[in-house]
Regions:
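N-terminal "mature-domain start" segment
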Residues: 2-34, 39-41, 48-50, 57, ...
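Intrinsic disorder
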Residues: 11-14, 18, 64, 150, ...
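Short, solvent-exposed coil/turn segments at beta-strand boundaries
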Residues: 20-23, 45, 144-154
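Short, surface-exposed beta-strand/loop "edge" segments at domain boundaries and coil↔beta transitions
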Residues: 46-51, 58-62, 113-121, 164-169
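Short histidine-centered catalytic/ligand-binding loop motif
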Residues: 52-60, 72-74, 176-186
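Structured beta-strand/turn binding interfaces of compact recognition modules in eukaryotic regulators
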Residues: 54, 145-150, 157-161, 204
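Signature of long, low-cysteine stretches enriched in small and polar/charged residues
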Residues: 70-149
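Surface-exposed amphipathic alpha-helical segments
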Residues: 156-213
């Protein structure tokens, strides 16, 4: 049984909230994070959860938008062996929208070979590229919440290591080899953490996006 303690977490100064375990620590407490990101990490398991606010990609269709962002992420990170394993259809979040216009949500799940697995691969302040010989196999979960009336694509991305290369720096923190299943260590599986973060995502202050109430 999971021993994770879930709680409502404040994002972007409280303008947004979401719910996920306390074991994910706010990276901004230890180093600077870009203004458009909120980054949380469990260093004991080398798992991370990232919230990003991006300008709306008007040239990307709603259908498969999460897959597009997942593949774009793989290109940015020079990931090898990228496979999109699952993608959702398009659905509306009636409880999340500006002036009655619901958000559009799609999700995708894939696998990548990366030479780093934690939050640093997104921040560009990494441990240092370690090369192809030190790649880890990582599960990546991505949700795209499209807030069209405020011109914003929200990305929620979760990273879960599957296989840690003994040559990677991650091995020093969590050990090399196949990752210990979360349930075996009393933690909620990353898929459930991701689901909670997405389904409990709420905007409290639309002024964050420059929108008038």
């Amino acid at each position: 049984m999971s021993e994770d303690l879930y709680t409502l977490r404040s994002l972007f100064g409280g303008a947004i909230v979401s719910t996920f375990p306390l074991r994910f620590e706010d990276v901004s407490n230890i180093r600077q994070v870009p203004d458009h990101q909120e980054v949380f990490v469990d260093l004991r398991r080398d798992e991370s959860l990232i919230f990003e606010l991006l300008d709306l990609k008007t040239d990307v269709a709603d259908q498969g938008s999460a897959t597009w962002f997942l593949q774009d992420l793989a290109r940015d990170q020079d990931a090898e062996g990228t496979m999109v394993l699952e993608q959702s259809g398009v659905f509306q979040a009636d409880g999340l929208g500006f002036r009655g216009t619901p958000a559009i949500i799609t999700t995708a799940f894939g696998q990548m070979e990366l030479d780093q697995t934690n939050y640093t691969i997104r921040l560009g302040i990494s441990k240092g590229r370690q090369g192809r010989d030190a790649q880890n196999i990582v599960k990546v979960y991505l949700a795209n919440l499209r807030l069209k009336d405020v011109g914003t694509d929200v990305l929620i991305t979760a990273y879960e290591p599957m296989l840690i290369n003994p040559l990677s720096e991650s091995a020093a923190a969590v050990g090399a080899g196949w990752a210990v299943p979360a349930s075996n260590s009393g933690n909620m599986p990353m898929a459930e953490v991701f689901k909670s973060a997405v389904t409990n995502f709420k905007v409290n202050d639309w002024g964050l996006f420059g929108a008038a109430a």
